[in-house]
């Protein structure tokens, strides 16, 4: 897992060069937006249970067969596993947003996820739909447009961070589809 700083140093070291120019400008921007980044992560994690439960509920509303006796969300145990998986994905997205790097998400969450779900018979389209609902909710919290929020969210233009969060969810969708 690399954060924004480690990534810049590693890249410069691999070229046997000093850190400078565009790399320093990118780090300056990362630092200047640090409070927005922290507030964005806080707004997501403070509303994590709502984001995940809304995503799973939305997925089930669109595909009620998931809670029928042969469905993948039938029984409390399977529903709990579905909610747990959503929480794990959201947690790793928040880690990626905090560090400004997707490697923690890719290495510790997405690696082998599609194969695991396939072996369990979990429908990829339902998973992808739940992730897209989580994406919409998380972006709304970062942009301060969510209707239900537990705390104040980042002030100022957070469209760049919202886009970054959306990109992390897109990686999840691509990994499970």
Swiss-Prot record:
Modification sites for N4-methylasparagine: 72
GO BP annotations listed: photosynthesis
Protein name according to UniProt: B-phycoerythrin beta chain
Upper classification of the organism: Eukaryota, Cryptophyceae, Pyrenomonadales, Pyrenomonadaceae, Rhodomonas
Species of the source: Rhodomonas sp. (strain CS 24)
Listed PANTHER family: C-PHYCOCYANIN BETA SUBUNIT (PTHR34011:SF7), PHYCOBILISOME 32.1 KDA LINKER POLYPEPTIDE, PHYCOCYANIN-ASSOCIATED, ROD 2-RELATED (PTHR34011)
Recorded superkingdom: Eukaryota
Binding annotation for (2R,3E)-phycoerythrobilin 1: 50, 54, 61, 129, 147-148
GO cellular component: chloroplast thylakoid membrane; phycobilisome
Subcellular location: Plastid, Chloroplast thylakoid membrane
Gene3D superfamilies: Phycocyanins (1.10.490.20)
Further remark: The light-harvesting system in Cryptophytes contains phycobiliprotein complexes. Unusually they are composed of either phycoerythrin (CPE) or phycocyanin (CPC) but never allophycocyanin (APC), with only one type of biliprotein being present in any one species. Unlike cyanobacteria or red algae these proteins are not arranged into higher-order phycobilisome complexes, and they are found in the thylakoid lumen.
The UniProt record lists the keyword Thylakoid: yes
């Amino acid at each position: 897992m690399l954060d924004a700083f480690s990534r810049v140093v590693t890249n410069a070291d691999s070229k046997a060069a000093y850190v400078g120019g565009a790399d320093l400008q990118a780090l300056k921007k990362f630092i200047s937006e640090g409070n927005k980044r922290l507030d964005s992560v806080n707004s997501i994690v403070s509303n994590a249970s709502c984001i995940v439960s809304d995503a799973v509920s939305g997925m089930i509303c669109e595909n009620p067969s998931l809670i029928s006796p042969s469905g993948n969300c039938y029984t409390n145990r399977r529903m709990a596993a579905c909610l747990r998986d959503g929480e794990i994905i959201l947690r790793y997205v928040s880690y990626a947003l905090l560090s400004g790097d997707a490697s923690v998400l890719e290495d510790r969450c997405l690696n082998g996820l599609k194969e695991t779900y396939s072996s369990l018979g979990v429908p990829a389209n339902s998973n992808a739909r739940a992730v897209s609902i989580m994406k919409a909710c998380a972006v709304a919290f970062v942009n301060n447009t969510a209707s239900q929020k537990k705390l104040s969210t980042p002030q100022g233009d957070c469209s760049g961070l919202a886009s970054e969060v959306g990109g992390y969810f897109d990686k999840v969708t691509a990994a499970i589809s």
